[in-house]
Regions:
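A short, structured surface patch at a secondary-structure boundary
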Residues: 1-33, 37-43, 145
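Flexible loop/hinge segments that line or gate small-molecule binding clefts
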Residues: 9-10, 44-76, 80
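Extracytoplasmic ligand-binding site segments that recognize negatively charged/polar headgroups
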Residues: 47, 63-76, 110-132, 178-180
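Structured C-terminal subdomain patch of bacterial secreted/periplasmic proteins
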Residues: 71-74, 79, 88, 92, ...
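Basic- and aromatic-lined ligand-binding clefts that recognize polyanionic substrates
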Residues: 86-141
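His/Asp/Glu-enriched short active-site or ligand-binding loop at hydrolase and phosphoryl-transfer sites
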Residues: 130-153, 172, 208
Length: 237
């Protein structure tokens, strides 16, 4: 398995052979293990597909860009591995949870949200509805000020343009190295006076999110993520 940056590996897999991280797995190790199939997120398909073909091992790339994609992948894996009953249990749980969650806030005003994804090294991009964190905000009832980014998960936007959009709420999360990234955000918001002009900053509506729940790929922590957003988007309700 590929080594996770921050998640705990289930006990039954802790003795499995480590092959590096998901973005740059050790192809030589994979080749010696001779798996029947390799599963990877589709965000890495352009980087890994040719490498898997080179070592002549079949691969499948799962859509983890949003929750609906993740559960579609679960349905497909259930069929592939003859685990359709188990897959259906997970899918039904998701559908029931989302139905109940939406009913609570269907009549509420949707706050306008800016999502910043911090990157190691001191920079950031804007997350759109096409990203996983953007999908969570959409499902929670928030309106992304940059919409779906015309299909792009992340976009580069000037602070001045963000100010023109004047979001009600600013959310900040990290791609990796959260401690370093959040320190960068604190410096950026303190040193760049343009941020002080945002209503969200003036009204103390800037929130730092845990990237265990608000990272790059959909995962089973989505309920915790939505419940976190529930407290942020509807704190006065």
């Amino acid at each position: 398995f590929s080594e996770p940056d921050q998640y705990t590996v289930p006990k039954k897999y802790q003795k499995a052979t480590k092959i590096g991280n998901a973005m740059t797995p050790d192809m030589e190790k994979i080749s010696t293990l001779k798996p029947d199939l390799i599963l990877s997120p589709n965000s890495l398909e352009s980087d890994l597909s040719s490498k898997y073909k080179k070592i002549k091992i079949s691969s499948s790339f799962l859509n983890l860009k949003n929750l609906s994609g993740m559960y579609k992948s679960i349905e497909e894996l259930g069929k592939l591995f003859n685990k359709e009953k188990q897959a259906k249990i997970l899918i039904d749980e998701y559908v029931n949870y989302m139905t109940s969650f939406r009913e609570k806030y269907q009549n509420n005003v949707s706050p306008r949200v800016l999502i910043l994804m911090g990157l190691p090294g001191g920079s950031y991009v804007v997350a759109t509805e096409s990203s996983y964190v953007g999908d969570l905000v959409r499902l929670a009832g928030g309106t992304n000020i940059y919409g779906d980014g015309e299909g792009k998960d992340f976009i580069n936007v000037s602070v001045e343009d963000m100010l023109k959009q004047n979001p009600d709420i600013i959310l900040r999360t990290s791609h990796a190295m959260p401690k370093q990234v959040m320190e960068y955000f604190q410096q950026e918001f303190s040193n760049n006076q343009t941020w002080q002009q945002f209503d969200a900053v003036k009204n103390n509506k800037v929130y730092d999110l845990n990237n265990e729940y608000f990272g790059m790929s959909a995962n089973f922590n989505y309920q915790k993520g939505l419940e976190t957003l529930e407290g942020i988007l509807y704190e006065n309700n």
